Amino acid sequence: MEKQITDILRNLMACASVTNTEKEIAAETWMLDFFRKQPYFQTYPERCGLFPIPGDPLHRNTVWALVKCDGADNEEHDGKAAENDITAAEDKNAALTAVPVPTVVFMGHHDVVPADVYGDAAPWAFDLDTIAAHLNRETLSTEAYTDLLSGEWLFGRGCCDMLGGTAVQMALLAEQAEKVLQKDDKSKKTQNGKNVLVEKPVKTLRPGPDEAVVDDGDEEELFGPGKADTCGALLFLSVPDEESFSVGMRGSLSLLEGLEEQFNLDYRLAICAEPNQRLADGKTQVVYSGSIGKLLPVVLVQGKLVQVGSYREGLNPLGILSRVVAATEGDETFTERYGDEVSVPPVWMYVRDLKEGYDFSLPKRAAGYCNVLTFQKTPAQVMAYFLGKIKGVLEEVSHPVTVMTWVTLWQQAKQHSGFEKFWQETERKERELLQEEHKTFPEVTLWLMQRTLDFLNFDQPAVVFGFAPPYYPAVRSEEMKDAARFAVYKKALSALQEVEIKTYFPGVSDCSYCGIPEGTQNPVYQVNTPLWGNEYHFAVDALARLQIPFFLFGPWGRDLHQAGERVNRYSLTEEYPAVLRKLLHCVW
């Protein structure tokens, strides 16, 4: 399998599928073509395809492919049909009520970050075979240069994040597809003039030295006798835009629900092939069972515009905003702890006045947005924290200042005549700013806040609070449905490989959209995000329905997004595939 994995990786890298470019479509086309060449998908062409991302101006797609043991979901029903000779109508009804098929989801993304950091070596950054020859001591860290000389690592843009893991998952899906097809061919026999599926064992784990990671006792306890002969369903999902705003994963929730219903699937576990680091011992790999949440609070301050000479009669919005920043930036009291994991405190990413040029007057408005990473805090709790800090700052201000959330401002605007026409034009311009002028979500959020204040002719001092996209819900697999079953998967993974399973992946990930606990769909974020709707959204209710527990678990990689990006050859081609094979059969 080593050759197949490296061949897939080589071809994926050659697509140079930089995020937010049409090159992402080149990768999608190549991946779908790879699957369609497999005999299994020639037999079942309806089990792979491209799912267009709704409303995406670049017309990108999610690539999906499903391998499913026919008859696995109808085992009891098939036996009953043969024994009792039930009618076709009864047979169809039984199929509709069949037990769903245990399903593992291989998930990842096919977009990569740009290669600018490679400097003179950039033209070869996407060439798996030649990039190493164009890297040297000057362009690499000492550790990376040592790895380069060792020959034990593969270099190049995307090999680590995350085309390497994607290549492994594609190769394993192809392997499983071949075995299932062979099983189907052998198990179709004619009895009493009817074709009946006769279940036969399928050995989906190849014996070999890479299988020795679990001793016999562990294997029998965790996987059970004959577990390697079981066969459920394996769904591959690769999305675009993970490196930007996760439009691919957000847009694919309806795909997941649709496939679940169409093919009678039971999503037991998702494995995101995000590259993992190792501890200092070089052996223990860090795996995550959750993903940190991310919010982007936006604060717009409107002061009272006067010439500097009349300072005491005015109000400088920069003074208020700077105090809000000082009260929240790096505030350790806001951080969260989960075991020995600690979240990062609030970090302001943008703070400035909104004057377009220089003059001898105070700025009318100033604004900023702040990066907030959460473990369990909700948008409502984050909003309450910032509003509390804002009101505390305003207690020291002599001028009266109105504090309002975005939803309050918007509801005031809705009461005014001409609002409908105003909002239609606003939404048209909003799309133009995002899609044609390539403004960012925070920039357009601030533009919407200012435009709405102007529509109301609101000229009194005020602070408006809201959120800008993106929003990544904090998630823990242990809070999903079937927590006891997931505990078994954790135990199995720990037996298969030397790992340290942590909870919150510290960088945001698409796994935030695998599910949220039932009853946590609070609308506070939606109603206080000016861009929520046409330009940014995801199906919150679908997350509560799906609830797919997951591991962020990929091959061992280093220096992703840097010129020294690399993936360990042994981890990629031997260790990771072997562990995934066995983990599949723990789930099935």
Task: Please identify what each model-predicted range represents.
Residues M1-R157, D185, D218, L222:
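Acidic/His- and Gly-rich active-site-bordering loop/insert found
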Residues E22, L154-A167, L315-L318, Y570-E574:
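Short, conserved micro-motifs enriched in small and acidic residues
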Residues Q42-P45, T97-P100, E220-G232, Q262-D266, ...:
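Short helix-terminating capping/connector loops at secondary-structure junctions
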Residues V105-M107, A233-P240, A270-C272, V463-F467, ...:
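Extended hydrophobic secondary-structure segments that form protein cores and membrane-embedded regions
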Residues A125-T142, E274, D281-V298, R337-W348:
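Short, flexible helix-coil linker/hinge segments at the edges of structured domains or between repeats
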Residues W153-K188, G193-G290:
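Acidic/histidine-rich catalytic neighborhood of metal-dependent amide-processing enzymes
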Residues R278-A280, S289, L295, V306-W588:
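Metal-dependent amide/peptide-bond hydrolase catalytic core
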